[in-house]
Amino acid sequence: MTIDTSDLLNSILGSLSRIDYIKPEEVPNIPLYMDQVTTFMDAQLASSKRYPEDKILTKTMINNYAKNDLLPPPLKKKYSKEHLLVLVFIYYFKSILSITDIQALLKPITDTYFSSSENLSLEDIYNEVFRLEKSQVDILKEDITNRYRLSRETFQDAPEKDQEFLKTFSFICLLSFDVYVKKQLIESLIDDLHQDTKEKKKK
């Protein structure tokens, strides 16, 4: 079995260098109807699709988010700029977190900062978080490269015809372990935040 993992790695690292996010100034300042929202999100996040037929967001998804308190309800069937920023958070979170966890994480944010007159706006939070994400790209590239090198050192004594597959399997396991540990940490942090929120409501 032949797998050109070096080309794949270079492709992944190259795509990491091109990672961008939807900047608030790119989000329309006028309220949008559902069809306009799905069209906008699909155009902006198309590069993150695994397969061309994948859907970024559908009407059903958005309705479910509103029903489950992940997204504040639209005003007269229209979605504001803040709605779209929340949808971006949901889009990234939903690949690793349950709907319940996303709700626990975002509800305090939307309750406090959505359409708020606070000094800190939802747009400010969005900008600050994604600014941090951009700063992590080089660190992430180095970490992935190191894991790749480690995986290439495994299964040296395996039959030659199986080595490439087994080394790739090893690389996937190394990456998966990292994801598993971080997911456990994220879930623990969300549980702590949720508990703090419940205790504050009791007071």
Over which residues does each language-model region extend?
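Intrinsically disordered, low-complexity, charge-dense segments enriched in Lys/Arg
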Residues: P108-K203
